[in-house]
């Protein structure tokens, strides 16, 4: 009888243990799920929104400096992708974009007059000229937003970074959604720029541009212990232009605002566009979105297909050493009359411009 009672107690004890173990396993599944904190939305796909840019995205081949182009065909489900990503897009106006043009006083007459006559005339309020010398005549004649940075006119790393530092601070002050930097030898195709940026949200981390190299740059990052570490990162070449969303620009502030940009540049001893890439890719770990819609004089511009020229975001032309490096676009102007081809492109985009030849007008 005693043995039977002991066996019974042992059985009850084992059943109790099994029941408790089962409860321990079931309790987490019975509790209501905890609410997760809001996570940042993913960046949109690196593609233009819709026609005409949809079919005109070009990327450089392995020889980026040579200017080779490879057309990227749109996927079959591109329209569905457009619908899925529509909530990422901004309904942009040109007034939402801060376009910074970097120049120097010696190019005021030769380059700025051409820009003010062409694309800048269509975006005067959105375009800000950053230079190193006062020019009252140009300011009054062209009605441009000219900002004298008081930086050196020398083409040195320090001078370039000084101007970029002022560009960044002025953009932050402007409260605009997008910062786009170009050089004074770029033509900005405004409709294409507007459509490209509309494919993204300005609150997201977006860094758009074209590398001048086919590989990441490697830099020696100086540290306080008198040593250095090697860092690799992509950067968008300033000669082709690049754009940064406001959301990302604000995150750059510790290394870029109020003169900190110059200090950061000295840390890696690289020019302004490289320093931008260093801050964004190496420090903030935000990847560059590579796009072939931006173009610089480093490329072979003659290889850009004529039928796609007006779909690009920026164009350029060769300097004194390579005057023939221009886009191949026909029009009423001869090469002698329009050596940069900027006037020809402008008259194709805006045929009703007063100075465009009549036969190109509607």
Curated annotation (Swiss-Prot):
Keywords, ordered alphabetically: Developmental protein, Differentiation, Disulfide bond, Glycoprotein, Glycosyltransferase, Golgi apparatus, Manganese, Membrane, Metal-binding, Neurogenesis, Notch signaling pathway, Signal-anchor, Transferase, Transmembrane, Transmembrane helix
GO molecular function, one term: O-fucosylpeptide 3-beta-N-acetylglucosaminyltransferase activity
Protein name: Beta-1,3-N-acetylglucosaminyltransferase radical fringe
Catalytic activity: 3-O-(alpha-L-fucosyl)-L-threonyl-[EGF-like domain protein] + UDP-N-acetyl-alpha-D-glucosamine = 3-O-(N-acetyl-beta-D-glucosaminyl-(1->3)-alpha-L-fucosyl)-L-threonyl-[EGF-like domain protein] + UDP + H(+); 3-O-(alpha-L-fucosyl)-L-seryl-[EGF-like domain protein] + UDP-N-acetyl-alpha-D-glucosamine = 3-O-(N-acetyl-beta-D-glucosaminyl-(1->3)-alpha-L-fucosyl)-L-seryl-[EGF-like domain protein] + UDP + H(+)
Glycosylation sites: 150
Needed cofactors: Mn(2+)
Textual note on the cofactor: Has some activity with cobalt but not with magnesium, calcium and zinc.
Sites where the protein binds substrate: 111, 184
GO biological process: brain segmentation; cell differentiation; fourth ventricle development; hindbrain development; Notch signaling pathway; regulation of Notch signaling pathway; rhombomere boundary formation
Origin: domain of life: Eukaryota
Topological domain spans for side Cytoplasmic: 1-11
Region of interest: Disordered: 33-80
Membrane topology summary: Single-pass type II membrane protein
Alphabetical list of InterPro entries matching this protein: Fringe, Fringe-like_glycosylTrfase
Organism ancestry: Eukaryota, Metazoa, Chordata, Craniata, Vertebrata
Keyword hit for Transmembrane: yes
Chain sites annotated for binding Mn(2+): 185, 297
Entry's family note: Belongs to the glycosyltransferase 31 family.
Active site as annotated: 273
Pfam families assigned: Fringe (PF02434)
Major place of residence: Golgi
Disulfide bridge positions per record: 151-162, 180-243, 347-356
């Amino acid at each position: 009888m005693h043995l039977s009672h002991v066996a019974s107690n042992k059985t009850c004890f084992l059943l109790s243990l099994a029941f408790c173990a089962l409860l321990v396993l079931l309790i987490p599944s019975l509790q209501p799920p905890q609410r997760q904190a809001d996570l940042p939305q993913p960046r949109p796909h690196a593609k233009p929104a819709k026609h005409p840019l949809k079919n005109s995205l070009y990327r450089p081949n392995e020889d980026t400096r040579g200017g080779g182009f490879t057309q990227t065909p749109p996927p079959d489900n591109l329209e569905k992708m457009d619908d899925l990503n529509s909530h990422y897009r901004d309904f942009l106006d040109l007034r939402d974009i801060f376009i910074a043009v970097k120049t120097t006083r010696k190019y005021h007459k030769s380059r700025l007059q051409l820009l003010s006559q062409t694309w800048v005339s269509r975006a005067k309020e959105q375009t800000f000229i950053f230079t190193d010398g006062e020019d009252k005549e140009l300011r009054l004649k062209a009605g441009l937003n000219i900002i004298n940075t008081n930086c050196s006119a020398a083409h040195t790393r320090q001078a370039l970074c000084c101007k970029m530092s002022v560009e960044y601070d002025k953009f932050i002050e402007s409260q605009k959604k997008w910062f786009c930097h170009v050089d004074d030898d770029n033509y900005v195709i405004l409709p294409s720029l507007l459509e490209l940026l509309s494919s993204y949200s300005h609150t997201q981390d977006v860094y758009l541009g074209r590398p001048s190299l086919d590989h990441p740059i490697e830099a020696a990052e100086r540290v306080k212990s008198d040593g250095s570490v090697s860092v690799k990162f992509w950067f968008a070449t300033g000669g082709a232009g690049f754009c940064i969303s406001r959301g990302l620009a604000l995150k750059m502030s510790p290394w870029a605002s109020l003169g900190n940009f110059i200090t950061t540049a000295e840390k890696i001893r690289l020019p302004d566009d490289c320093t931008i890439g260093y801050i964004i890719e190496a420090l903030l770990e935000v990847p560059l979105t590579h796009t072939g819609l931006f173009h610089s004089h480093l490329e072979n511009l003659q290889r850009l297909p004529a039928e796609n020229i007006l779909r690009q975001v920026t164009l350029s032309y060769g300097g004194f050493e390579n005057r023939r490096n221009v886009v191949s676009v026909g029009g009423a102007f001869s090469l002698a009359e329009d050596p940069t081809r900027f006037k020809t492109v402008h008259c194709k985009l805006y045929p009703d411009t007063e100075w465009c030849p009549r036969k190109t007008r509607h």
